[in-house]
Structures are given as C-alpha cells and as structure tokens.
Amino acid sequence: MLRAPIKGIRRSSPDQLEPSVGMVDLADRRKLLERRWTLPRAGFPVTAGRTDTMSIEELSARQPTLIDGDVLLPALVIKRSALANNIAVMQAFAKRHGVLLAPHAKTTMAPQLLQQQLDAGAWGVTVANVFQANVARLAGARAILIANEVVGSPDIDWLIRMTRDDATTMMVQVDSPASAMILERRLRLATDGGFLKVLLELGPAGGRTGARDETAITATARAIADADHLRLVGVTTYEGVVAHDREPDSLARIDGYLDWVKATTLRLAEGGFFDGSERLIVSAGGTRYVDRVIERLAPGAWGGHSVDLIVRAGCYITYGHGAGLNDTPFFDAGPFGQLTPLLELWAEVLSVPEPGLAIVGVGKRNVGERAGAIIPLWVLPRGKDPDSDRAPVAASDALTISGLDDQHAYLAHRPGGIRVGDRIGFGLQHPAALDRWRVVPIVDDAYRITDAVATFFA
C-alpha cells in the first residue's frame, strides 16, 4: 500500500518532482568564510610576517594572482569559468531528460561547491557515509542519498536524528536481509517510532555491493517489507563496475545490465514490495555512463508504475585533462555544451640538473597515487624583472612527465627550454584530486584569485 510522499520533495505536477532545498544557514556559511588558516599555506599569498593566519574572505578580498608570484606553490586552483560551465552543462542535461540530479559529494567534499550545484537546480546530494552526509547538510542539502549500506550503531543513530527533521529527505541502501535487520533493530530502540526510507541495491555478479540474484533480491525485499521501521521506496545500482570504458562491447554490457535492473524493478513492483511514495525511485549513473542510464532507465511510466530517476554523477564538476578520462558523453560539444577541465596544479622548477631534465616541486603527496598523470599545460618563464607583466604560454608537446616522487616531478624537455624558477601549470588527468588540499583557490582567466573553497575529506 502506498503511503505519504517522500518528505523534502514538493510536487509541482503529476510528472515531475522538485527539490525542497534550503540554503545553508548563514551563520554556518559565515563561519566557513571567516575560518582562519595558518600560514604559510599553498595557494595563499606570502605575507612577509604581517600575519600568521588568513581567512578565505580576506584571501578573496586581496585577489592575489599566480602571475605576480605572491602565491605559495605548489598550488591547486579551480578555474572559475570551467566551474560555472560544468555545473550548467550537467544541469541542462538532467533537466532536458527529466531526471533528478544528485551529484556525489565524494568528488569535492566542498560545501561551497555543493551549494553551487544545489543552487543551479540539483535535486539533492549523494554521499557515501554519514560523515559526508553531514557535510552535505552544511552545504544546504535537504535531500541526501547515502549510496551505501549503513550498519554501524552510531551511524544509524545519526540517521534517526535526521529523519526527525521534516525538511530533510534521507535515503540509504540495503542489499541483504542482514543489513535490513541491523537498521530495523536500531530503529526499534528509538522512542518516536519513526521510519527510514531505503533503496534496495542491485549488483552484478563479481561486482561490489548489491543483491545479485532473484533469490537474494526477493529475500531482501521481504525483510524490508516485514520491518516496522523501514520503507522500500525504490532500487539503486552502480553500473560503473560492469565496464570501464565506452568501447562498443562495454556499452553493450552496460545496456544489458541496466535492462536487467529495469526488469527486476518491475518484478518487485508487481510483487507489491514498494512502499513509501506514489512514485518509485530508481537511482544509478556515474558520469561515464549517465547517457546509457537515462536511455535504459528513462523516468516516466514503467507499465502501470510511475518512476523518478536519480542520477548520481559526481566527476563532471572536476572534469579531467587528457584522453584517458574523456570517454564520457560530454567529450564532444553537443546541445547541452561540453565539459571543460576544472583543475590546474601550479609548481616551480627547482632544478635543471642535466640537459633535458628539470625537477619540479610537485609530487604524489600533492596529486595522490590515484590522480594519474599530470600533463604540462602552461609555462610561465621567470623573467629578469619579476614584477613585469607576463602571461603563461602553452607548453610544448616536448614537455612530458617521466616520473613522480613524493615531492618531485621529473620533467623531460628540450635542453635550454626550461630554467630554474620557471613556473609550470599542469592539468590533472583524473578528476578526483581535491582530497590532498584543505583550501583550494578559485581563479579567473587571468589567474586572479577571486574566491576559495574549503574541503572536508576528513
């Protein structure tokens, strides 16, 4: 039997759900902007002893530039124009296809960036755990999808507190009778008799989490139906473990898997397992296959059932450089625009110890093991007059990174082309590179720092 609509969602028409997204509390946002960061710090100006701390608000007011050489390097920066573009491109794509966008917070863990995505029209925020969910709340999210199982008692207690907030939509995943019963037993101890909305997670054989076969799926659905404090509002999956590129055979495997997800959802619906909303929720979709998800799991009428599709793409906002990760539906310009690389990493040439080799002051500690190759994009030569007007020039194809140590990069170049003190601007091939940085400046196209974001990965 269907119950009340999901909290935190207002219905504007029979065919569309819209978010009820509250803005971040002004006091919390003010605290974030006024928080003082100890200097010296990467990306902040060197203040020659005038102060030992600086806030993001002060940094934005000062507007130093990378060109002036007053900013401590290495520094990761966000291109402001790319940020606005990428948010707009994905939101337009979601709106055109009638899907609800819940960008994954794990990509940036930056409340200020999440708030911009919400302001642009995102339905809510996807997270991996309750810590990330709390960061999403700081961003002002009033619809939060925890794309994971939650089994720890402290975590469940936090969820119980959140479900008492009528303004917040909170959904979690369940993939087994065991995970359902852990939630139910903890909820049973709560005194208010509340309930938690859950999505049954489906998964492929050999994949990650998720119920694999009909027996496991049915057993999990029955366990949720038998629970007094759980309501099954839909299904969820992550198709990204089925394939890892956009070759034709990979896309065929993705399509086949998504067709199975749809058929399984319809079977559960016909069995009367869903409860908690007038419309079924189906959730999937990282950035790489979001177009396939929308085609195979298109929202609307599935037989006699109305379905809303929530896509959880995250890496679109920090779209990377290089061909290795550009195999997304947004690589070529289309009707919704084209994603553009967001992040640049700037560092100085520390040494030219032999012809054709320069050592740059950036390494694995700055980009992480997972960030993959860094790609030389720009060279800012060290001029005779450090205060003269200069602009970065495009890096030659002859500049390549041959290796990374913890704090050093090996830059191959034509002898005589690179000098000690030159600054190099790198692109990052993998978009998940913010986790090594507590504060990341935002720069305009002239590399003037106009703002900064704080990250909360831990």
What are these regions, as identified by a protein language model?
Residues 23, 354-458:
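C-terminal accessory subdomain/extension
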Residues 290-383:
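Active-site loop ensemble at the mouth of alpha/beta enzyme cores that anchors a bound cofactor
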Residues 83, 106, 136, 200, ...:
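Conserved, mostly hydrophobic/aromatic
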Residues 188, 197, 204-332:
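Active-site loop/helix belt of alpha/beta enzymes
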Residues 102-247:
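Active-site-proximal beta-alpha core segment in soluble small-molecule metabolic enzymes
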Residues 68-80, 143-146, 164-171, 246-255, ...:
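Glycine-rich tight-turn/loop motif centered on a GG-T
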Residues 9-161, 453-458:
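A charged N-terminal "starter" segment
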